[in-house]
């Protein structure tokens, strides 16, 4: 018996989207398949206190050894995929589907003179066209109820049909125009079969021409002032649009295709492949592979196709072995004999014709290698892409939460950077701006290889004009460590030093650690030699050594992922598959995310600033009232206190304060604000308050 906690996914790793989940036993066999509107909410139920679960559920979760899932777009797709995989794997705990029935389908008995629309289960019959399967029979009846008003085909049994013909009176559906009543001769066999053919075409996905035809008829009826008929056609159009929800995981019958998608970063890539056979998703496989070089998605596609279909082995990192910890197989490997006629990829490989020719030789027949651009195949590709991203996110979460991997990363960093101790506290700095405006910087902290978000800090750059990332980095590092020295001086560990902030920058005695109380074991800056030199200069100015015996410093350059140290002509090259480089990347990316978030926030705030912001007691509501009344700040400045006081909500005293504040911000004064944007109209306002 397994403990469910031993294979419970990490917190936050399960998506909140619709999907299908699979429990496997210790031998890898699928023992249960289920669907969920929210995978996170549903799977959380299985990992609750085991004593609160149903006895059968207890047995299932203790028999299982792992759980995996596949995300889809809608609940309908989840129902469809659940059905497919229950029939595929025959899981032992899915007992309610283990009878001799299958899911119901919508069947059209084309072999009859007057074809009938009906719910049908069991094996397929000759001369019957099927649509579905559906999860429930009531879903078929709802669909028919919507469509019969547009396609009034026969739905009654043979006995009812014959009896109506004998008495010369149709059933109720014939009286309410939901049946064309061929039983009493209202339409002949040819006319009724045309209705049935139109119904089949519509259910096959050819919806556009019927909708366009009904819309033309509706407009014509409205122009002819036949309003009742126009209203009925309008309702018919609505019924057609509600009747069929497109199912991306089900392609037209007979479609055999493999759908491949990737999610990647600089070091790794996740690949997902869905096997579509007979229009149904019959299986799914996924891997996370190492990238030994800077390859494009097209290169990844070529490597995957050759290894998956031509070598007969799984795609792999360096030696052709998959990362088994992140492999999710729901289908057998696809040898050359199973190469489908169509392979859908996100990008064509560089030499697509040659790859296609090799695949055709292996298959012995034509193979179409293509990128889906629209329609159901494009929608299915997007579903596979979401699964690849989800698998990649889960892989990164597992790796970041792996204590052994984190310990190895810290040890590797200590060795590579020749640090006296493992860098248990890492601080990373990044600068963000838009063409030199709203310049900000971020500081993120990782302790024991995990983010410590309560220690994150943001800096608004004050001493740098224009776009100068190097000077901004120097200011940021200088400000951070000057506060650290001030804290040491406050506690008596260090004598006072010139320029150290005191008093106002100190937190009250609350018992909590002060904002910059702890020194880092390693400082990482986002950038190459210029940024590293700027940070080292800031430390030197404060009398802090950068290197052994002081604060270790390095920079991580983008693209090539080189690690630069102060006063070194050559970078430190960490193996691309090392945990140390992966940790530095996570730290750098988190600093970049935090800086970008703050920069966007600050830029958004500055976009709605105006001279009226400096008026004491004037809130946003009254500022908008002023701008709505006068039209611009310039016209407010030109008005007198008495005129301003006429605006609703503005009293005489507030009007005088507005006049005084605008006078201080007039041209020629030191307090004149920079150009801003009128928050009401969106127009640009110059320093004189003139709207341009």
Swiss-Prot record:
State the superkingdom. Answer: Bacteria
Query: Is Cytoplasm tagged as a keyword?
Result: yes
Residue ranges of every copy of the GIY-YIG domain listed in the record: 16-95
Stored InterPro entries: GIY-YIG_endonuc, GIY-YIG_endonuc_sf, GIY-YIG_UvrC_Cho, Hlx-hairpin-Hlx_DNA-bd_motif, RuvA_2-like, UVR_dom, UVR_dom_sf, UvrABC_protein_C
Q: What are the protein's GO molecular function terms? A: DNA binding; excinuclease ABC activity
GO-annotated biological processes: nucleotide-excision repair; SOS response
Where in this protein does the record put region Disordered? 492-511
Keyword Nucleotidyltransferase applies: no
Alphabetical list of PROSITE patterns matching this protein: GIY_YIG (PS50164), UVR (PS50151), UVRC (PS50165)
Question: Where can this protein be found?
Answer: Cytoplasm
What region holds the UVR domain?
208-243
Ordered alphabetically, the record's keywords are: Cytoplasm, DNA damage, DNA excision, DNA repair, Excision nuclease, SOS response
What are the annotated GO cellular component locations? cytoplasm; excinuclease repair complex
Purpose? The UvrABC repair system catalyzes the recognition and processing of DNA lesions. UvrC both incises the 5' and 3' sides of the lesion. The N-terminal half is responsible for the 3' incision and the C-terminal half is responsible for the 5' incision.
Quaternary structure and interacting proteins, as annotated: Interacts with UvrB in an incision complex.
Q: Which family does it belong to?
A: Belongs to the UvrC family.
What is the name of this protein? Answer: UvrABC system protein C
* UniProt source species: Parafrankia sp. (strain EAN1pec)
């Amino acid at each position: 018996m397994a403990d469910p906690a031993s294979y419970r996914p990490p917190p936050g790793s399960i998506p909140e989207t619709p999907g299908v989940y699979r429990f496997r036993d210790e031998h890898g066999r699928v023992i249960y398949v289920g669907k969920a509107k929210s995978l996170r909410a549903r799977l959380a139920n299985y990992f609750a206190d085991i004593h609160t679960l149903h006895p059968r559920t207890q047995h299932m979760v203790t028999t299982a050894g792992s759980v995996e899932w596949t995300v889809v777009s809608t609940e309908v797709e989840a129902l469809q995929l659940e059905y497919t995989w229950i029939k595929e794997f025959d899981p032992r705990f899915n007992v309610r589907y283990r009878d001799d029935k299958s899911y119901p389908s919508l069947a059209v008995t084309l072999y009859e003179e007057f074809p009938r629309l009906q719910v049908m289960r069991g094996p397929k019959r000759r001369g019957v066209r099927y649509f579905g399967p559906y999860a429930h029979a009531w879903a078929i009846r709802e669909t028919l109820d919507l469509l019969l008003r547009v396609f009034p085909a026969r739905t009654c049994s043979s006995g009812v049909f014959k009896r109506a013909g004998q008495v010369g009176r149709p059933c109720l559906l014939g009286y309410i125009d939901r049946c064309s009543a061929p039983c009493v001769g209202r339409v002949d066999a040819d006319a009724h079969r045309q209705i049935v053919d139109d119904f089949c075409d519509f259910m096959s996905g050819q919806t556009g021409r019927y909708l366009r035809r009904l819309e033309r008829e509706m407009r014509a009826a409205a122009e002819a002032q036949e309003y009742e008929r126009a209203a009925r056609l309008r309702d018919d159009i609505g019924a057609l649009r509600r009747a069929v929800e497109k199912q991306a995981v089900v392609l037209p019958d007979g479609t055999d295709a493999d759908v491949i998608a990737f999610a990647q970063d600089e070091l790794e890539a996740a690949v997902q492949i869905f096997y579509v056979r007979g229009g149904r998703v019959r299986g799914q496989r996924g891997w996370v592979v190492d990238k030994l070089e800077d390859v494009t998605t097209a290169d990844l596609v070529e490597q995957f196709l050759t290894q998956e279909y031509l070598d007969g082995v799984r795609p792999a990192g360096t030696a052709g072995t998959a990362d088994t910890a992140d492999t999710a197989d729901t289908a057998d490997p696809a040898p050359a004999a199973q190469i489908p006629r169509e392979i859908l990829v996100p990008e064509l490989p560089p030499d697509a014709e040659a790859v296609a020719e090799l695949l055709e030789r292996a298959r012995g027949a034509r193979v179409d290698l293509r990128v889906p651009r629209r329609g159901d195949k494009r929608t299915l590709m997007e579903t596979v892409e979401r699964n690849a991203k989800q698998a990649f996110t889960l892989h990164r979460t597992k790796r970041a939460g792996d204590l052994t991997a984190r310990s190895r990363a810290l040890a590797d960093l200590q060795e590579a950077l020749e640090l006296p101790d493992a860098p248990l506290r890492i601080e990373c700095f990044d600068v963000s701006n838009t063409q030199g405006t709203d310049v900000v910087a971020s500081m993120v902290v990782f302790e024991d290889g995990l983010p410590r978000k309560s220690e994150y800090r943001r800096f608004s750059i004050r001493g740098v004009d224009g776009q100068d990332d190097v000077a901004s980095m120097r200011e940021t590092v200088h400000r951070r460590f000057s506060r650290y020295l001030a804290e040491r001086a406050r506690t008596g560990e260090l004598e006072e030093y010139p320029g150290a902030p005191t008093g106002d920058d100190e937190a009250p005695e609350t018992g909590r650690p002060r904002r910059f109380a702890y020194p880092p074991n390693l400082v990482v800056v986002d950038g190459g030699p210029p940024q590293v030199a700027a940070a080292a200069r800031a430390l030197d100015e404060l009398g802090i050594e950068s290197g052994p015996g002081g604060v270790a410093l390095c920079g991580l350059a983008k693209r090539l992922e080189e690690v630069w140290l102060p006063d070194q002509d050559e970078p430190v090259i960490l193996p691309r598959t090392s945990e140390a480089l992966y940790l530095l990347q996570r730290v750098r990316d988190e600093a970049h995310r935090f800086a970008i978030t703050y920069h966007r926030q600050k830029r958004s705030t500055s976009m709605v600033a105006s001279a009226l912001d400096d008026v004491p007691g004037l809130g946003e509501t009254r500022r908008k009232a002023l701008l709505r009344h006068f039209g611009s700040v310039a016209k407010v400045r030109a008005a007198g206190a008495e005129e301003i006081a006429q605006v609703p909500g503005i009293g005489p005293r507030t009007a005088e304060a507005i006049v005084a504040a605008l006078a201080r911000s007039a041209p020629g004064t030191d307090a004149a604000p920079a150009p801003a944007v009128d928050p009401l109209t969106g127009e640009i306002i110059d320093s004189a308050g003139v709207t341009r």
